[in-house]
Amino acid sequence: RHFLSSVSRILRHQVNFNEITLPERIVKVDSFPMGIDYNKFEAAAQNHFKNTEEQRTELQRRLDHHSNETPEAKLILSIDRLDYTKGIANRIRAFEYFLDNHPEFIEKVRLVMLAVPSRSNVPQYQRLKREIDELVGRINGKFSTVSWTPIWYFYRSMPFENLIDLYTSCDIALLTPIRDGMN
C-alpha cells in the first residue's frame, strides 16, 4: 500500500489497484509475507507426536535410537540451502573448534546438517559443496568413535515429514548466515 502510494505521489506513475502503468509496460505489485506457515508446521508436529512405532519414518527411528542410546546427548540442527551466504563452512569450522576446545562434549553433541542442493551446475557452488564435503569428512574422521559420528550430513532435499522429524527431535537450531535477510 505505501509503496504504491509513493510510486503515485513521488514518481507520478499511474497506479490502478496493484498495477503500475509505465510507458513500456505494466508492473504488477503484490505482497508476499516472509516466513513459514506456522499452523501447518504446528499441526504436523502435533500429529508427529501421536505416531505409533509402525508409523514412524526410518529417520525418526534413527533419531529415537540416538535419543534412547545417549539420552544426555544433544542434537544440533542446521538446515539451509547450499549457498555461500548461509555460512555453512564457517558453521562446520566452528563446530570443529568447539570439539577441539571442549573435548568433554565428544559423544555428547552431534551436528545434524541438511544442505539442500542449490545451483549445483554453478562452479562456485560446486566448489562450496566440495569444501563442505571435505570439512565434514575431516571432522568425522578426526573425532568419530566406534559408536559416535560428530556430524550427520545430508546433501539433498527431504520430504516434509522428515523435516518434522528433525525439528521435533533436535535440541538446538543453529543458523549462521553471513549475508542473508530472510532468516
Give the location of each predicted region.
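Catalytic cores of carbohydrate-active enzymes across secretory and cytosolic contexts
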Residues: 1-183
